[in-house]
Amino acid sequence: MPQLLLELLSEEIPARMQAQAARDLERLARERLAAEGLLPEALKTFAGPRRLTLVAEGLPAAQADRREELKGPKVGAPEQALEGFLRKTGLTRDQLVERDGVFFATIEKPGRPTPEIVAEMVEAILRTFPWPKSMVSGTSKLRWVRPLRRILCVFDGEVVPFEVDGIASGDLSEGHRFMSDGQPFLVKDFEGYAAGLSHRSVVLDADERKERILEAAKTLCFARNLELVEDAGLLDEVAGLVEWPVPVLGDMDPAFLDLPPEVIRTSMRVHQRYFAVRDPAGGKLAPHFLTVANIAARDGGATIAKGNAKVLSARLSDARFFWDEDRKVRLEDRLEKLKGVTFHAKLGTMYERVQRIEALAGELAPFVRDEPETRTKAVQAARLAKADLVSGVVGEFPELQGIMGGYYAEAEGLDPEVVDAIRSHYRPQGPNDAVPVSSVAATVALADKLDTLVSFFGIGEKPTGSRDPFALRRAALGVIRIVLETRTRLPLKRFVSDEVLDFFADRLAVLLREQGKRHDLVAAVFALGDDDLVRIVARVEVLSAFLKTEDGANLLAGYKRAVNILRAEEKKGPLPAGEPAQAAGAPAEEAALVQAVAALDARLGPALEREDFEGAMTELAKLRGPVDAFFDKVLVNSDVPAERENRLRLLAKVRDAMGRVADFSQVTG
């Protein structure tokens, strides 16, 4: 079946926009093709510095013919209504069909040729493409990320003819801006297109560009007994800057190695898009860097390396100046400047935030580790944790906040635990980032994140959908991970509102789902009013294991049956009060369940009190047999009112007893 190939060639597309642009192009094309009944066998998109490409395999040459039935006026309706319907359909009265007293028209619609639909589709995509930022060029009214230069659109080897703001579609593409002959080349299909680009020094696929960069970079480093410091984010960006990647290894002045390694790496990455290089023996940074050129230089990259080394030297000289100047001022002496730094218009200055975090750290410390020394150090670290925000290095490299504070604290000779807490109080900053494990560092990190959550929820700035401008989901997940991994028994209700506690429940459910655990059980346990995350997760894990057993699954079914009966009765009026009785003449199964519930009631409390959740589940399991037998042999809705009321009391007792372990009504499975 025919193939569609589309290339949108433009000036340089920002690297950060390319991956999303490829996804958007695929989504828009799929939606529009599907709306026209055109379903490709395969569809793939590519993005690079100068081009967006789409290839769709297995498209039909035209739409299938369609038949539509239109409902018209009722038989006997005014003549004007019928005439209007005939004009609309283009039919005569004899061609209408009467059914159930209504006129119907059957319209035969021949399928449109695919190229005609594609032409409309491409123009619509060009005019509605969701670039984060776009521009107009010259007299064109078309908004595109950068000036659009050429549109290649070929279907089944032939040009799909159309024009958008003076740019006519064609069957020509271009190679590398500098390494090709500069002449357009003819394209008939994707295979020829990809081969033509490769022959003209363009690697179409971003993943292939990344593979080439990594492979060549590691080879260069290995030849010099060095090791590349891999950086996935930087690799993604660099692969979006070059069409023909050529790694080049350069040298820098070894004197700069006395700077903190984070400063060197950040200066390389942020300002120059260089990779750092280290000594594989000791793991320390080596006086070298790796840049990725967009051309294969005749001198092997020597001139490129020399020029880049000169630029890097200037950058690192600036960083050294800031580093030297920053160490002349104590962190404590920087606090006054935080009064001039706004944290948020509704939440005051950064100095006020520091005061909140400092106070919160003092309250949290006993729960993390109940020692006076821990509290003293945590309060000191919390007070100084944000002081580096007004330092020169952090002003230049905001991503180093906290890290630089740790270096400055170390230079002042502060306690190592205080240094560590300042350095790591932002952690974890992502799902793969380690949590601070020392008691002082964990306390300060918790205080920082809890203040963020309480403050922003307090002014109504809550995450909605995909929008989370203040990273509150990350903050909540950070609190959860710190608490769980340090086994901190933290009563969250003492520090957060019910709304924030519900938010923690949601994030904990997400975390457990990502770990392949029963996330629905989080709501079932949170419903008990517990706010100790360590205890909640322990209960969830044991409950999850219990529900996988035959006893657990059957008992859950019995619980839901009991609850459904009770809910139906509650709609009629209040349930009978009091305890279920051992009624004379009652069925043996009823008496057995009364005894089983009473025994469970007596043993369940102590097990839960000592947090023996496995023991609690063992006790629950003993209820399964009596519950099954009761429902098999006993009629709850007895004609005898006293019997019926006693059995309803018994079911309520079963519900309440199980409800001490979890709210089983919220369990989905």
Curated annotation (Swiss-Prot):
It is found in: Cytoplasm. The gene is glyS. InterPro entries: DALR_anticod-bd, Gly-tRNA-synth_bsu, Gly-tRNA-synth_heterodimer. This is Glycine--tRNA ligase beta subunit. It holds the Pfam family tRNA_synt_2f. It catalyses: tRNA(Gly) + glycine + ATP = glycyl-tRNA(Gly) + AMP + diphosphate. GO terms for cellular component: cytosol. GO terms for biological process: arginyl-tRNA aminoacylation; glycyl-tRNA aminoacylation. It comes from the Bacteria. Belongs to the class-II aminoacyl-tRNA synthetase family. Keywords: Aminoacyl-tRNA synthetase, ATP-binding, Cytoplasm, Ligase, Nucleotide-binding, Protein biosynthesis. GO terms for molecular function: arginine-tRNA ligase activity; ATP binding; glycine-tRNA ligase activity. Its EC number is 6.1.1.14.
